[in-house]
Amino acid sequence: MAPAADMTTAPTGVRSDEPPASAFSKPGGGLPVAAAMGGEEESDKPKVSPSPLPFSVEALMADRRKPPGGRDGPEGSGPPLGSARANLGALTTEAPTSPLPLGGHFPSVGALGKLPEDALLKAESPEKPERSPWMQSPRFSPPPPRRLSPPACTLRKHKTNRKPRTPFTTAQLLALERKFRQKQYLSIAERAEFSSSLSLTETQVKIWFQNRRAKAKRLQEAELEKLKMAAKPMLPPAAFGISFPLGGPAVAGASLYGASSPFQRAGLPVAPVGLYTAHVGYSMYHLT
């Protein structure tokens, strides 16, 4: 115990010539040197108190309750809001497509705690993803709805230099009809005299007679068609007109079953075969 006594009696600041005590020797305090060194290292490290996660419900509610200007503790000593937003923008611009960096460093919990509240809220509730640039191009955008234009008129277009239609009066029409019944074709002298009496031109009278003759021809053809349809007999189709001798099958049946049938009725006199043959449809048509 002599070295321990010398060390205690030696004044402070004076270098001792004795060799330093080994790590396994017990000093006067009774604790090993390694334990003392470990205690010093642990005392140098700051003790981190367990704090709730910044994205938990309690942390968000506590941040909202605090006034915006009076933040204390580790959050108040962090970087300003502008620098935090700049760091967040840099992180989003570097890897917009990959949610987790591959081969890089993950942001620490302390860095997440220093982020502003707006950034955390946006990270938790992301908005709808924007359309990619290739979808915004007009090549992939849906075509606008087409408005259906009205169909073009398919009526016959008249000539531009066409003369207007002549409006005949009732007296003129009656005189023209009366003259047409008397004579359908007028001579040049008759047409000139008749047009002057009606205060019309010869061309107007001539065109009216031409149209009236065409109309009379159409009416005459329609009347002839009606007469032809009425003159045709209303006969049944030829498929049902089967000719066979009257009484032929009855005679054959009587000769075949006459002896064996006790309830045979007396048959009517039948004419010889082939004497009276008639078309069934024709006979029924004339009998009715």
UniProtKB/Swiss-Prot annotation:
InterPro entries: HD, HD_metazoa, Homeobox_CS, Homeodomain-like_sf, Msh_Homeobox_Regulators. The keyword Nucleus applies. Probably plays a role in patterning events during embryonic limb development. May also be involved in programmed cell death. One of its GO terms (biological process) is BMP signaling pathway. The gene is GHOX-7. Disulfide bonds: none annotated. It comes from Gallus gallus (Chicken). Residues 1-12 have a biased composition (Low complexity). This is Homeobox protein GHOX-7.
